[in-house]
Amino acid sequence: MANPPFNLSDWGADKLEKDARWKFGIPPAGNANFAWMQHMIHHLSPVGRIGLVLANGALSSQTGGEGTIRQKIVEADLVEGIIALPSQLFYSTGIPVSLWFLSRNKQQLGKVLFIDARNMGTMVTRAVRELMEPDIRKIADTFEAFRNGTLEDEAGYCAVKTLQDIKAQDFILTPGRYVGIAEQEDDGEPFAEKMQRLTSELSGLFKESHRLEDEIKKQLGSIGFGIE
């Protein structure tokens, strides 16, 4: 498991242009995300796995050839799973990140698991969120079911996609593209009745807004700042 610096811009790219580790393409000089990833892949054993935390930009960036590098890594069938994590997990930064799981020994060849866990976790302070034991267990169980071939897609949370599916999305790996939207439970209220109720509530809000507007004008006028 690795957590390299996010989006590192000064990583000595000019000294490593012909490095043997860049099998999938030379990483851009302004961002080391795919340099870290290719360094780890280069040293990965035939049965090894990598867990890598990266800023979300690595999932979709096309800058400096990153899109091509990502495409080649996907086409090499090294990507086992992508998990989009909630924001505010780190004390040092609030940016959202993702977990990449790479493997040379995938049990589900030609398939990738996508998990959208952005809504998981609990705010433990006003600035920091933590994934709790039930959250971690759900994610772990989902991965285990995927590896065993027993996982069923869950709208809004997880989906298993083929390399062809990913190609159709231009090799962008953002989980939200693949898991869809969670199904909303039907409240049983007929559409016509719901619309009548909502429009009535909206009308009441408009009336209250006009009343407050008149009151504000009145108060401003009383202190010599009238509004026409």
Region locations from a protein language model:
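A conserved structural/catalytic subdomain of Rossmann-like adenosyl-cofactor enzymes
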Residues: 1-228
